[in-house]
Amino acid sequence: MAPSHPHPARRSLITGAAVLAASAALTPLTASAAAAPQRRPRGGDAYPHVQWIPASPSNYTAANRPKQHPIEKVVVHVTQETYRDTLRLFRNPAHRASAHYVVRSADGHIAQCVRERDVAWHAGNWGYNTRSIGIEHEGWIDDPTWFTKRLYRRSARLTAAICDRYGIPKDREHIIGHVEVPGSTHTDPGEFWDWARYLQLVREVSWQFEMDTELDVFDAPPAGSARERAGRRR
């Protein structure tokens, strides 16, 4: 649940933690590694029907997970931005934050922005960054209409696949909200995120090779007041 006192934008908060991450021992990925938006990441990270839209190399740290760091958790986020604007932020070298995946509200379309082997700067806690996969969900924490059936189901499929890949238990100890990260000042995914529904889906679904139509990443956001609310933050 969002605190009663105002906070800065979640992106500005993440940025501060990301600067600390940049000083870690891992070597930042060079600019030449940034792939074109339609290419999939190397190393087998991509799941079927996930669109590769890379974050700027300035916004994450190159690594060799799980050899270098075990992957033990999935962290659920809410963007407080539109899908389109979130991707633009991740591709901005000055932003200093990223997540591995972003799920679109209207249709559950998934963009992968950082390879799973690399450390996305999403949790605001370096230890949690190194040991987790971050999934952003388009929406605002005070408006549950953004948490659509398709968003829940596609995200749950992705989380289930990640858990299966790394042997992560499908429970609330290992699938957590950003708010649960130690030292976090964030409140996402918020009180309207249906954890019972989400965990049930994670345990029931499997990644399906659906013949989905790849949609343009710069499609308009779902109908509503997204542009009017673009300045709102938790």
Labelled PLM ranges:
Residues 79, 138-140:
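Short strand-loop junctions, especially beta-strand C-caps/beta-turns
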Residues 2-9, 37-54, 141-234:
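Basic/polar, cationic surfaces and motifs that engage anionic cell-wall
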Residues 2-124, 129, 232-233:
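N-terminal catalytic cores of peptidoglycan-degrading enzymes
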